[in-house]
């Protein structure tokens, strides 16, 4: 009788999920507040621990203002986060930015609570 080849199953390698916390902004501003800097410092530590990971910073605004104005403001918000991460030692070539202005609200309502949620930067991991 011929011997059947032994089937060896490869161990499954769990891919580590890397999540970076979003930051929020004041109305019509792109400056980083102390609490947003703390979040960015934590995000920088995560990026340092995963040096092959790249990130896209998405700048978002609330619904007030024109499309053009909010696209520009969203880009300034994304760039302010990028510049701070670079200052913290993250290579600029690992970070790209995009602005969605007011096109992708987290909360579609028209009130201060919703607007505060929508004024944000989100961090999308690219590997």
Residue ranges and their predicted role:
Residues 58-127:
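Periplasmic OmpA-like peptidoglycan-binding domain that tethers envelope proteins to the cell wall
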């Amino acid at each position: 009788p011929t011997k059947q080849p032994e089937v060896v199953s490869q161990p499954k390698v769990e891919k580590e999920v890397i999540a970076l916390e979003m930051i929020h902004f004041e109305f019509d501003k792109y400056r980083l507040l102390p609490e947003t800097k703390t979040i960015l410092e934590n995000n920088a530590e995560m990026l340092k621990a995963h040096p092959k990971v790249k990130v896209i910073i998405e700048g978002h605004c609330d619904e007030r203002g024109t499309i053009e104005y909010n696209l520009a403001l969203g880009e300034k918000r994304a760039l302010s986060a990028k510049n701070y991460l670079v200052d913290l030692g993250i290579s600029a070539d690992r970070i790209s930015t995009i602005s969605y202005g007011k096109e992708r609200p987290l909360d579609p309502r028209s009130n201060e609570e919703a607007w505060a949620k929508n004024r944000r930067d989100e961090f999308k991991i690219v590997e």
